[in-house]
């Protein structure tokens, strides 16, 4: 059995760690509420943008446009959104597993890493990191999202890449987050994604042309999805970290209870031993 001194040292160490996990949980809770509110404010716009593009493609007949077909290049850009810090449960590792477990050929991928954790993990696994940006995830802005999307879209229209994907964590609620890998370009709209109030039999004409309308709206569509993913990722990260720190705090409490019991047993044993020695000494004298 460990000595009382060793047990007290372990308890002190665990108590210090518990104070840290409690503080981190509190910070994550505050950040989560802020990020959650931001996501709730921006989601209606992004959903409307998606429905607009869905309706536009459904009502425009057959359109021959570069944004609607894969390029000749086999290269695929994948924007990977993770965090700069750990201690968030499986938040970062789930995104990495999503990439490594996908059908995408590693040799064809150009990784645009938003957040250090994803970059580090994929780099260790031999993926090519085309771009890294650790600052964007700390304070997402539509302007930064637009600047990166313009760069990737140019590579797409120039034929340097054939497809564009986005890997991020979808925020469902405080305790539920889902890693997702979606294709941004070429645009693929599922039939069920078109708003219910749209009549697919109605064709629309756009001025000056449908192709020129797509030239304007698709970049905004891609940027909107990307920015929305950034906002959801921040909320998911803080939700995951809050849960992880809550679990760590609870585990520390259980360990402290076990150590307290162990300490009391050791103390009781020491007292018993001392009494035994006193009684034995008294008996020897008498």
Predicted regions: what is each one?
Residues 1-286:
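C-terminal beta-strand-loop-alpha-helix "lid" module of Rossmann-like NAD(P)-dependent dehydrogenases
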């Amino acid at each position: 059995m460990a000595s009382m001194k060793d047990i007290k040292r372990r308890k002190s160490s665990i108590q210090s760690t518990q104070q840290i996990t409690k503080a981190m949980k509190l910070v994550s809770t505050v950040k989560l509420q802020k990020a959650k509110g931001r996501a709730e404010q921006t989601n209606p716009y992004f959903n409307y943008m998606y429905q607009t593009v869905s309706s536009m493609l459904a009502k425009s007949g057959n359109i021959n446009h570069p944004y609607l077909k894969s390029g000749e290049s086999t290269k695929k850009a994948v924007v990977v959104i993770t965090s700069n810090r750990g201690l968030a449960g499986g938040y970062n590792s789930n995104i990495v597993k999503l990439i490594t477990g996908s059908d995408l050929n590693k040799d064809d991928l150009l990784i645009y890493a938003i957040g250090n954790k994803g970059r580090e993990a994929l780099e260790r696994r031999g993926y090519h990191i085309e771009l890294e940006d650790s600052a964007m995830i700390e304070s997402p802005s539509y302007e930064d999202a637009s600047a990166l999307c313009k760069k990737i879209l140019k590579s797409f229209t120039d034929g340097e890449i054939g497809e564009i994907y986005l890997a991020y964590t979808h925020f469902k609620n405080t305790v539920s987050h889902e890693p997702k890998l979606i294709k941004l370009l070429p645009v693929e709209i599922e039939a069920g994604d078109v708003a219910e109030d749209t009549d697919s039999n109605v064709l629309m004409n756009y001025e000056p042309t449908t192709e020129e309308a797509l030239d304007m709206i698709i970049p905004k569509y891609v940027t909107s999805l990307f920015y929305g993913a950034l906002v959801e990722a921040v909320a998911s990260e803080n939700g995951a970290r809050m849960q992880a720190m809550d679990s760590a705090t609870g585990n520390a409490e259980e360990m402290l209870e076990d150590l307290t019991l162990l300490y009391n047993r050791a103390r009781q044993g020491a007292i018993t031993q001392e009494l035994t020695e006193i009684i034995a000494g008294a008996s020897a004298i008498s």
